[in-house]
Amino acid sequence: MPKVDPETQKLYDEINGLIKKFQDDHKAKADCTMQEKCGDMSDIPKIRLSSKKILKGHINKVNSVHFAGDSRHCVTGSLDGKLIIWDTWTANKVQVIPLRSAWVMTVAFSPSGNFVACGGMDNQCTVYDVNNRDASGVAKMTRELLGYEGFLSSCRFLDDTHLITGSGDMKICHWDLEKGVKTMDFNGHAGDIAGLSLSPDMNTYITGSVDKTAKLWDVREETHKQMFFGHEMDVNSVCYHPSGNGFASASEDQTARLYDIRADQQIALYEPPQKNTGFTSCALSTSGRYLLCSGIEGNIHSFDTMKVCHNGMLQGHENRITCISLSPNGMCLASTSWDQQVRLWL
C-alpha cells in the first residue's frame, strides 16, 4: 500500500476519533433494548412462504428484480443482456427487452407500470416505455441518462417523470425524465452507492454505501439529513419501514440492522444462526414485523423485527441470491440469483 504522509494520517485519526465519539454518544442515549421492550410480545408464526413458481427465461446470472405498483408485474435484469417483464400470476413473459450492454446491475419499475429503467457497468441509466414499441416490436427507449463516472448500482422512480439513481462514483442524481436533464446531485458518501430505498410518501430516501454507512436524504435538498453507523462492511441494501419512521439495512458483515430515524440510531441487530453468509438484499413485510434478507450462500433468512430473532429460512436457489423484491401488496416475494432463476415465494 502507498505510504500515507503524517498530515494525512493525522486527519484520518481525527476523523475516526470524531466518528467514535459520535457513536459512543448515540449508545449512551440508548436507555433500553428492543428485546427488553418487546420481550413479552407474542411470537409470530414461522415464515411459511414456499417457492410456488420459477420464472425461466434468462440464460445468465440474474442481478435485479423490482415489482410494479400493481403487484402483478415485475421486471428482471440479467447478464444475458435482457430485461424481462413478467406476469407473476401466470409466470408468463410479457415483454423481452434486449439491451445494448449486457452488464446490467439494477432495474426499476415505475409505480404506474408504464416505464422500466436499468443500468450497470455501462455507466448510464436507460428508460423504456413499456406501452410503446419501436419498429422492431421492442419497448421504445425514451431516455439515456449519461454523465456517470462509475457503474449504476441502483435506481428508483418517484413517478413517471422523475427518477433517482445511485452509482459507483459516490453520487445520487435526481432526473427530470420529461426534459432528460439532471436536476440535482446529492453528494455525501465516501464510497460507492450500493442500495437505495424511497420512503412511503416519496419525500425522502435512504442510501447504503460501501463506506459502511446509511444516509437519509430529502429529495428537495442536496445534503443528507442524517447518517447512520454500525455496519463494519459494505451496506449492500436498505429498505424503508412501512411506517416511514425507520429502515432496515443488510451488509457484507453478515448482519442486518434496524434503525429508528426519530431516535437517530440503531435499535436492533439481526444475525443468521450460523455466521456464514453476507447479506445482499433486504425487504420488510407490509406489517414491518418480518425482515427478509438474502444471502450469498443462496438462502433467504427471515427475522422477527420486534423479538430480534431468526424466524426461518427459504431454500431453493443453488447459488448467490442477488436481489429480493416484495410486491407492494405484500403477497409475493421475488428473488433473483446467479443460478439464472427468478423465484416467486407465496
Curated annotation (Swiss-Prot):
Gene Ontology terms: biological process: signal transduction; visual perception
Repeat (WD) residue spans along the chain: 57-96, 99-138, 147-185, 188-227, 230-269, 274-313, 316-346
Alphabetized UniProt keyword annotations: Repeat, Sensory transduction, Transducer, Vision, WD repeat
InterPro entries registered for this protein in UniProt: G-protein_beta_WD-40_rep (IPR020472), Gprotein_B (IPR001632), Guanine_nucleotide-bd_bsu (IPR016346), WD40/YVTN_repeat-like_dom_sf (IPR015943), WD40_repeat_dom_sf (IPR036322), WD40_rpt (IPR001680)
Lineage top rank: taxon: Eukaryota
Cited function: Guanine nucleotide-binding proteins (G proteins) are involved as modulators or transducers in various transmembrane signaling systems. The beta and gamma chains are required for the GTPase activity, for replacement of GDP by GTP, and for G protein-effector interaction.
Subunit (UniProt): G proteins are composed of 3 units, alpha, beta and gamma. Interacts with Ggammae/Guanine nucleotide-binding protein subunit gamma-e.
Sequence similarity: Belongs to the WD repeat G protein beta family.
Protein name: Guanine nucleotide-binding protein subunit beta-2
Record gene name: Gbetae
